[in-house]
């Protein structure tokens, strides 16, 4: 009986734990795990197939091969369990212990663990303070290392060659000790006194001044402190005992034909054992030192290969010349333990099949093939059969199901009812890639899918397959029904738009039904109600598009909200509408007016319609409405009978003339080129321009002809109406196709690009209707093939970006309702070049206001701080013209180890405030990664047509208002009385009467201001003008010009204008100066006052010096009088090269990886006055003197464009050298808000170009994760080291503790990490190891004795617990609460007992129970 009870006991609950710690195992620890030493390299006996004793598969060490049976067969059956057979030494127990029992190998000579030696930076090297090269020479027996110098002048850890060693031995005898091999290294490690070393290092760190030393000491200190804290001894990095993996985890499987398939590990272990045994024998035989040494080296190499094959030297190979797969290879990479088995598991109760369309289904249903359902729900059916008494045993039930008796189908129906299943379509790029549906049993073998969910799954019916999963437990079913049911997921989490938008046929049907035609059959009739219209339509008295008058009953929300009053009341109105729209009004949900349907329904309109329905009528009504829209759309599209034929592609008659004119113009350019009037490049650019314009013109002519048709109205007059051409209707409604595609069918194909992206100058003038000739067809193949190649690359790159994003954000979960912060960001409409790119309402919708929103007219509070701004609120804000609202953002959230709901705002996929437990990090990553495949891969060359877009030369106001300048705007008044701008970052704003900003424009340096601060202007007024082709250098002081180093032929050259014959001086490049000229002088101007003294900068002793850049055209003469604001020189901007703009996916990756751009612009570190110092070779020295008089130097390459010149005042963070911005500089000089604005805007630019809508908050969430580490600048009394990077939450916790104890907290700087780096530097070593660089992460974690608190989602998935998000978060919270209350109760009981009994006396003799055998 007891045995049986024990059997049941074995299915014990897994232990509950809250953290996992990793460390180094000491030799004793390894021996304690082991069940015996593996002494022989043999595996199994080839005749008996029994494992050899003491071999790698030994049953005595690892356990029996069959359950409860020893090897020799003396003891069989359960009754002997636990007995150890005296004949073969095998314990009688379950065979599965062979999966968990380890063995060990006692190494005859210690061996260094390769991970701690070779994984960079070498940990052994750090601890010993020796170079990797030296340690390797010692370990692999090429050199000696001094261990005890004794009384000799040698130093400890000194490396000597063999020759050296023998000389020293002759010299000093045995005064000193030197060793080679791992023994020597082990001795050195043992000799280290960690506490003492840490003390000396800390003092050294305080006293040293050199950067390099500080870095070196800090690194070493970190490693040593880790050893000190974790209690791990450094000498454990040298192995004396090698653990042996349980045999079932490195199996040996017999194949047919008497051969064996074996795990590579067995080979590697065999080599180690062979070499170890040989070494033992050599040592016993007292073999010569050189032989022993060689054997020890070979043993070291064998162990290296076992642990990480190929890390050092050549990889060990098996019989077939491929490298053997070592222990390290088992866990790393895509096929390793982490990614293959722990993060990606296969699941039971699942099936897959092809999908077909199910237009008759409701939104929450899917059609499940009967046979599939039968297989998936088998256990449920077995249970039902037994309960009903149809079958007595499981076996009988199985037979019933196999025979598919009628009763089985009835039961299947019953089992399936109300039991949702989950459908998944790979690739699952966002959370809508898995949704739950209620199954409907169908015949056939294909799954039926509702058409409206296709958009979310990105599915089509051209052979796509989907997988079905069955949620088993009641909790799982509940979650599937409440959270994942398709009808509960109608919004995209990325942007809050509806995801159940009709497409293709449905759109076409609805569009066709809601179009209006002039003089349709029955036009002008009036009807009393919709039913009458339907009757007339069914009797062919009217057409769908005829204009008629109908009385329509709308259900409007009741004003009377008292008890018992109905929610909606009918309202009857006579509308002028069309037959189709009237018929559609039948399905309008309660609460929506008919006006939403009373227009042609194009795709965008339908999307807006569903969105309005969701906001006004709620989820249920919307789902029903969408379903009915779909049914109607399909029905109407079928009735419409729209088809395409060749005649629908109307080629415009004026095409030939347009193309002919273009060809003439091109000939003219060819002639000019031949005459040498234009360069080849200009000719090419112009030709391309002409053809693209021609293409546009033909397209326009074609669309004009296609989009309207002549028609006779009721009065017999001819008018034009929108065309009922099939192709036009498809494109116009948004069902299929676009203007560009129609242009290729009926206009001209236009210009094609070569594979390298350059445009071929001869266009394809034909279209598809006319047909292409051979050459045209050939040119077309370029694009088609490049498209396919790009798509393949794009998918991989996009997937990798998503993976990195998920990894960096996976632990970000909403953990509380409100963190109570008063920080936020000021949101304004996004304006580029005076155009509103994104309205304020879109940017603040669904966010929480952080300051009261005040009505600018009445100054009363509209919305208090802490209000979630919904549609009504943002519409009101927009109506009142409020242009700036401060809102909460994930970036400033003060919650530690998570986010709070208020800072995140609305959950876009649900339309309400985000719930605690929502995994917002993963959602953000999915929202950014999912559209990745739609982005382009290419970098754009700005050349030809694009770059010659008109260069702006003035700004004008777009609205009426008052001119205001930003604080950075500075200008001087010149002799003519004009205001000349002398600041680099000045901006002009237009504000309305309430002081609200309406628009803002950048005004460049050197511009002439036409309006001053405070001027009232009308729309269209010019604010400032400037010369677009040159950049001026302007003097801020008056005086007499005095040239310095302006020598013709040395620093400047004379240029004579061919046309005007005037001469100007041009500053020449240093490299082009004559040999005799000094390279360091730079041409500059000083100003003299009336007395001939140099003019000084006010308030300083510096003389005004204005330097000229290379390429500057000097416009003043020596000795000329100049006034304030006069132009001294001009720099032509023509010289700007056409830069490649990184676009698309690579740009997004570049931003999130926080890479510094190649030629980054330089920002001013401080506010102060600029001056130029002495130039070095190829660099110019720019000095900024701050207000205290301290000087900050920048060295700038000569070819860079310096945006400032002498004696100019710049503000901190202003750009002083032209180039793309470096995000790290922005963070350092302008702060978190500026950085976030930069990254959000730049990422959005890329997506906006592709027409992809993503909410800003997703990008902000990622930026928050990129900023999650800080760098300690002063450690105060904390445990950190200056210069160390630590997790922000950790540091804040530590600082709180310091303040509580009255000690000094640490101060820190923000650090921006790229997403890969941030993922790897996370506190969770499990998460980091499963991402990339597994070896390095694990090595580091083991030395530090890191503990993983299982905070993120990934760690929990890997260890197999519920993830701490959603219901899992609640589960863990409840569990922890219960544990702590249990502990309290336990303490209480213990206290009471002690109290009751005083001191417990000696325990009474326990009565002997009869044994329960």
Swiss-Prot record:
Cofactor annotation remark: Binds 1 Mg(2+) ion per subunit.
Cofactor: Mg(2+); Zn(2+)
GO BP of this protein: DNA-templated transcription
Residues given in the record as Mg(2+) binding sites: 460, 462, 464
Record: residues binding Zn(2+) 2: 819, 893, 900, 903
InterPro entries: DNA-dir_RpoC_beta_prime (IPR045867), DNA-dir_RpoC_beta_prime_bact (IPR012754), RNA_pol_asu (IPR000722), RNA_pol_N (IPR006592), RNA_pol_Rpb1_1 (IPR007080), RNA_pol_Rpb1_3 (IPR007066), RNA_pol_Rpb1_3_sf (IPR042102), RNA_pol_Rpb1_4 (IPR007083)
EC numbers, comma separated: 2.7.7.6
Catalytic activity of the protein: RNA(n) + a ribonucleoside 5'-triphosphate = RNA(n+1) + diphosphate
Pfam family, one: RNA_pol_Rpb1_5
This protein's UniProt keywords: DNA-directed RNA polymerase, Magnesium, Metal-binding, Nucleotidyltransferase, Transcription, Transferase, Zinc
SUPFAM superfamilies attached to this UniProt entry: beta and beta-prime subunits of DNA dependent RNA-polymerase
Binding residue positions for Zn(2+) 1: 70, 72, 85, 88
NCBIfam families for the chain: rpoC_TIGR
Annotated function: DNA-dependent RNA polymerase catalyzes the transcription of DNA into RNA using the four ribonucleoside triphosphates as substrates.
Quaternary assembly: The RNAP catalytic core consists of 2 alpha, 1 beta, 1 beta' and 1 omega subunit. When a sigma factor is associated with the core the holoenzyme is formed, which can initiate transcription.
Family, as annotated: Belongs to the RNA polymerase beta' chain family.
HAMAP family membership: RNApol_bact_RpoC
Protein name listed in UniProt: DNA-directed RNA polymerase subunit beta'
Gene giving rise to this polypeptide: rpoC
